């Protein structure tokens, strides 16, 4: 299907030609600036001076209009280039599904085995080197004779993958649709399938696993036809950040903390690198060192999966589960280096780091509960507490449940559905206008990069207080309802979630501006 890329190539070529034309026009405009704006009077009389002033004013107006035209031209070129990219992505998605169907058809009746590999945020089409690495380490040792291929997913996460782009929720939902189609095509062709998802790809697989579990018998693939391998899973039941704070919603990111990956009929293996901030987030966020270590682990540990040696993967620790009937195996890959100390390496002498790391690791581990079952969804808490439920008259719950639920819903609607979208769109619009103005004045690349990073970061920071209010209200309502229902354990858990969530959000609120400042000062993109 190579012909489908002809149009994007033409569009890209046109964008390149327009960019060259824009550069030529800018040079011509700049060359004409002084002769047209600083016209000298032909003589010393008032009439000559007035004529010179008139022509000079027209020249200045021309320069102003040229700057606006240049900014518009620049935006048009960028939009044209982006359109070509979007076209390629859409065609690649269709091609991926068609290729998958063709592969399945060619292997019909031959007992084919296919490994579908998904990428992470920012990698809609997994590169070959990445696929080869994860296949060798996580698929080949357990699934013999499988041929791997990459599956296109949007892999977007506004604002980190651009403005505009799909939110995390939208991207994962769309990716799950592609994955379901690919799985069903392969199974219909008589092939066995193993799905490998990394990071956002693991969240895509999580949605698909939930969907398959909801299908009636005879519609979903049988357990001997399908398996899953997940790496750096944000939905890890005991450690995934999307399961640590269930029900939390961050409107500025379009991100719902949608809970744990289910244990289904399909054999599943979940690999987690220790201190990966997405997949191994602390249970007790009151431990600030553990929080900061996990935040840095997003950068230093989350990308380790495809760089580990086969021996390191094989030495992973199989975590305990609640039942021998569990179909999911959870493997923790020990991290030899604390992410908290990684920025200091090369600056602080290694012997000193080696001296403090064991004690620091012991303190950080206090933020975790490694004794819990890996398959049990485990939300954040303040400290280990075990309280048995007591009986409370049920009429109390009936009296207060309705108004509290209404309050929770009202705050969520006002803040997340009404106020926050206005704030986000306003900041995006202001950033776009600043970018145009900067281009008009010929601002250096560092300035335009700073404006774009500001567009990405400011909505998160401005809307932070609203996220705290809605999260705290949600957990408080749940706590009171648990108390009214006689569930002191649930009451205690939800009360602990309030400060635990606040601490985690505040740590991120401090870390994001720091990372943004470094990116601006170094002229780099905000790291994703």
Curated annotation (Swiss-Prot):
Residues 94-143 are annotated as: Linker. Residues 1-93 form the PE domain. It holds the Pfam family PE-PPE. InterPro entries: AB_hydrolase_fold, PE-PGRS_N, PE-PPE_C. It is an enzyme of class 3 (hydrolase). Its EC number is 3.1.1.-. Optimum temperature is 37-38 degrees Celsius. Residues 149-369 form the PE-PPE domain. One of its GO terms (molecular function) is carboxylic ester hydrolase activity. GO terms for cellular component: membrane. The active site is at 199. Optimum pH is 7.0-8.0. Keywords: Hydrolase, Membrane, Serine esterase, Transmembrane, Transmembrane helix. It is a single-pass membrane protein. Esterase activity is significantly inhibited by the serine modifier phenylmethylsulfonyl fluoride (PMSF). It catalyses: a hexanoate ester + H2O = an aliphatic alcohol + hexanoate + H(+); an octanoate ester + H2O = an aliphatic alcohol + octanoate + H(+); a butanoate ester + H2O = an aliphatic alcohol + butanoate + H(+). It is found in: Membrane. The chain crosses the membrane at residues 503-523. Belongs to the mycobacterial PE family. This is Esterase PE16. It comes from Mycobacterium tuberculosis (strain ATCC 25618 / H37Rv). The lineage of its organism: Bacteria, Bacillati, Actinomycetota, Actinomycetes, Mycobacteriales.
